[in-house]
């Protein structure tokens, strides 16, 4: 399997906010072939998707604003439809705050629902961690519960090695433990 290295557009957030389409052009000029979207208001999903196609970029995924506690089914459908227009291969929930078992179950159910919608439209679904998911809740980390309570055929994990390490985890061990469910990885430097 060939490793695909791309840029998470969060790293050029200021530029995106000023001119999303021009920033995509600059990313392509820098030699990137793969991008991971981040929500920035301004351009329509069609404009972004058309620009990505024009530049020969592949949108491997999209971090979306989706609140597992308040988003409705209709909200989820719109997110999926917008990402189809953006030619995104996957949708990512970039963190859910879970401090109780009830909250974990709510996030897991929302992930399962969004993942089923994504799959029906030819996309994958991922959960992206930060450090909060590694707090203990009823004998396990919230992250372990989330892995256990989500459908292994539908919900995958994008391991952010920085945040996993900040949360007290050994990122390589976490990736190995997730196995085929860890298909995307975020890496960035961490100071001492």
Q: In which residue ranges do the predicted regions lie?
A:
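N-terminal pre-domain/capping segments
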Residues: 1-89
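Conserved beta-strand positions in the central sheet of alpha/beta enzyme cores
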Residues: 6, 36, 61-63, 91-92, ...
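Active-site beta-loop-alpha junctions enriched in small/polar residues
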Residues: 8-12, 38-40, 64-67, 95-98, ...
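Charged helix-capping and loop-helix junction motifs
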Residues: 21-22, 73-78, 104-112, 139-144, ...
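Active-site-adjacent beta->alpha loops and helix N-cap segments on the catalytic face
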Residues: 41-51, 99-106, 110
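Anion (oxyanion) recognition and catalysis
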Residues: 53, 84, 112-115, 119
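Active-site groove signature of glycoside hydrolases
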Residues: 86-103, 121-132
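Acidic/histidine-rich catalytic cores of soluble enzymes
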Residues: 120-192
